[in-house]
Structure formats: structure tokens, C-alpha cells
């Protein structure tokens, strides 16, 4: 017999202190399979009226609703809620309040490297790899397990400086710009130097054991990290990992 409720835990972070509440989600009907976002919206409406979290499109297009569910990043709008789930903010970014994390220290890494000097030409067509990378929704799930991002130790939400070390997201942005047919050849060297300055070498040393996962299924290892490494260090990455 199907239950009319789900029992979950929601972690709250306020004034540098963490707490946990038990929340009983009331299904609209016994067959309902709610998303985690549905749980948060109901909890805010009925129990914790100042519960803080982000969401936008509700259709897996924007990535801003990403939270940790049982310790792993998931899109709240597309993750089915289950009994005993634990909902918490992304562990890889500093918490502002409750489930809201500070995201802009990553985007600051790309200042000066997200503009194309050439005028748009609709007759210039990018290849399939470029279009694959445009599927990124900036959910930052790829930060989980990244050995390079761990070096940033992102704990202070009041720090507005760009993180010194890169991550799969920032390298995806650089790789997409690198293979963009509108990017002039003379700018590509600067893109590779930027990747090196963000610590690309760390991936090179342990490429074989690198485990990074994209929230929407982009093959970050093969489509982002490997081509950047090859552009930066020639075929050395191929020889090193055979």
C-alpha cells in the first residue's frame, strides 16, 4: 500500500551554524512521485516560511536549483524525492543561507575570457563538439570530486575574489571558446595560458584516474579536459596515460 507522505531531512545553515529539520511531505495523491523542489516549496509554504533556496526554469535548463541530496549534487527540479533523503546545500561552494550558495567566485575566473572580438557571422558553423558543450546549464555539479577545485577551499562567502584554481566548469568555458570558429587564432594562445594558470597541470598528472561528472551528461574528461591538455602539452597526455 502506497504511503501518503515522505519523510525527509533538510539541512539549514544560518549565522554560521547548521541545523537539521525533519520534514514530512504530504503527497497530493498516493501515486505522486514529487521532485525535491516540490518538497522544498511545500516546506516553505507550510513549515519554514523563510526557507531559502534557488530555482528558476523547473525544466533542467538553468541549473540554479542544484542541491546536494544524500551528499551528491542533483537538480532539485529533476531529482525524485524518496523517504529518508537528506537535502543540503552544495558542499563544494560557500553557503550564504540554508540551501543558497555563493556561485560568482567561479565566474570571476573568466573575466576577460568570455568575449569574442570577431563580429558574428551566421555563415560560420561550429562542429558537433562545440554544440555538445553548449548543453552546460551551469549547475556546478561537476565540482564534486574535482581534485583541482578542492584546492580552493571555498568556505568564506564574503570573499569576492576569483578562485585561484580551476574546475571542470571553467575549463569547459575555455574549451568552448577555444574551439569556437569565431575565436581568432591569435586569441587561442591566451586561452591555453589561462587554462594553465588555473592549474590544468593537476589534471595532467592524474588524468587516468580523474572522475568528474556532469549534471547533464557532457563527457567532461574526453570533450573538455583531454583536448585542453593536448592543446597545452601536445601529445604528452596520450603517452603519459598509456
Task: Name the predicted role of every residue range.
Residues 34-46, 90-91, 95-242:
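Ferredoxin-type iron-sulfur electron-transfer modules in oxidoreductases and energy-metabolism complexes
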Residues 2-103, 143, 147, 152-155, ...:
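Iron-sulfur-associated redox domains of electron-transfer enzymes in respiratory
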Amino acid at each position: 500500500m502506497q504511503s501518503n507522505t515522505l519523510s525527509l531531512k533538510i539541512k539549514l545553515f544560518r549565522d554560521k551554524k547548521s541545523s537539521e529539520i525533519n520534514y514530512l511531505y504530504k503527497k497530493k495523491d498516493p501515486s505522486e512521485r514529487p521532485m525535491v523542489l516540490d518538497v522544498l516549496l511545500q516546506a516553505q509554504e507550510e513549515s519554514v516560511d523563510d526557507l531559502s533556496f534557488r530555482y528558476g526554469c523547473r525544466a533542467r535548463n538553468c541549473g540554479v536549483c542544484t542541491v546536494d541530496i544524500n551528499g551528491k549534487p542533483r537538480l532539485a527540479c529533476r531529482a525524485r524525492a524518496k523517504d529518508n533523503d537528506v537535502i543540503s546545500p552544495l558542499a563544494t561552494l560557500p553557503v550564504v543561507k540554508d540551501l543558497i550558495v555563493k556561485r560568482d567566485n567561479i565566474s570571476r575566473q573568466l573575466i576577460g575570457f568570455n568575449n569574442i572580438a570577431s563580429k558574428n557571422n551566421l555563415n560560420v558553423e561550429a562542429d558537433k563538439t562545440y554544440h555538445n558543450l553548449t548543453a552546460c546549464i551551469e549547475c556546478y555539479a561537476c565540482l564534486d570530486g574535482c581534485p583541482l577545485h578542492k584546492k580552493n577551499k571555498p568556505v568564506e562567502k564574503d570573499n569576492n575574489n576569483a578562485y585561484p584554481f580551476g574546475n571542470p566548469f571553467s575549463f569547459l568555458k575555455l574549451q568552448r571558446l577555444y574551439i569556437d570558429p569565431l575565436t581568432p587564432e591569435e586569441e587561442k594562445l591566451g586561452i591555453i595560458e589561462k587554462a594553465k594558470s588555473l592549474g590544468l597541470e593537476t589534471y595532467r598528472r592524474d588524468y587516468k584516474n580523474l572522475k568528474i561528472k556532469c549534471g547533464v551528461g557532457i563527457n567532461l574528461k574526453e570533450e573538455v579536459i583531454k583536448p585542453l591538455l593536448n592543446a597545452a602539452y601536445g601529445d604528452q597526455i596520450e603517452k603519459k596515460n598509456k
